[in-house]
């Protein structure tokens, strides 16, 4: 039992020693690299950490809004960052020149310190990424001449070009051609019925002639 306790105490002591060593190493790195210190102070993101990017010195508005932003965020925890920025910009415009002057002096002091600390610093604005053009899009000339085969009702193939007017016209012609014999038969029947009705309206002699011309009917 004592052997188990001694091993646990020994393991805990080793972990405590490693933690102390890591803290000592990190503190040495902090004091020996001023560039990384400035980067950590300005809260650089992970993308710029490999390049040790130096940020610009704060201007008068940034100096003033540093404390004001924290105050507004505490008073309005539900307000978004964009809304806070709009409100701070409006409040900054409402200040007089006398009220802004201390922040301009502080910004000038910070710029002087920045020049001494980074004499080779040059402002390099980030370029906005251009949207990539897709090669799948067809030019206007080729898209206007697009022609493809489409099946309507699985029995009327027609050609589609620029609009559906030709297809609709050809489809209507097919329907008219298919129904044309029925229409012709109906028209012939109407003509025969009209001729019979007009002939029966004539004289009694004509009616007798038509009746005698008909074959006799014998019921079965």
Swiss-Prot record:
Transcriptional regulator that controls a genetic switch in male development. It is necessary and sufficient for initiating male sex determination by directing the development of supporting cell precursors (pre-Sertoli cells) as Sertoli rather than granulosa cells. Involved in different aspects of gene regulation including promoter activation or repression. Binds to the DNA consensus sequence 5'-[AT]AACAA[AT]-3'. SRY HMG box recognizes DNA by partial intercalation in the minor groove and promotes DNA bending. Also involved in pre-mRNA splicing. CDD domains: HMG-box_SoxA_SRY. One of its GO terms (biological process) is male sex determination. Interacts with CALM, EP300, HDAC3, KPNB1, ZNF208 isoform KRAB-O, PARP1, SLC9A3R2 and WT1. The interaction with EP300 modulates its DNA-binding activity. The interaction with KPNB1 is sensitive to dissociation by Ran in the GTP-bound form. Interaction with PARP1 impaired its DNA-binding activity. InterPro entries: HMG_box_dom, HMG_box_dom_sf, SRY, SRY-related_HMG-box_TF-like. Keywords: Activator, Calmodulin-binding, Cytoplasm, Differentiation, DNA-binding, Nucleus, Repressor, Sexual differentiation, Transcription, Transcription regulation. It comes from Zalophus californianus (California sealion). GO terms for molecular function: calmodulin binding; DNA-binding transcription activator activity, RNA polymerase II-specific; RNA polymerase II cis-regulatory region sequence-specific DNA binding. GO terms for cellular component: cytoplasm; nuclear speck; nucleus. Gene3D superfamilies: High mobility group box domain. This is Sex-determining region Y protein. It is found in: Nucleus speckle; Cytoplasm; Nucleus. PANTHER family: SEX-DETERMINING REGION Y PROTEIN, SOX TRANSCRIPTION FACTOR. Residues 54-122 bind DNA. Its main location: nucleus. The gene is SRY. The keyword Cytoplasm applies. Residues 194-220 are annotated as: Disordered. Belongs to the SRY family.
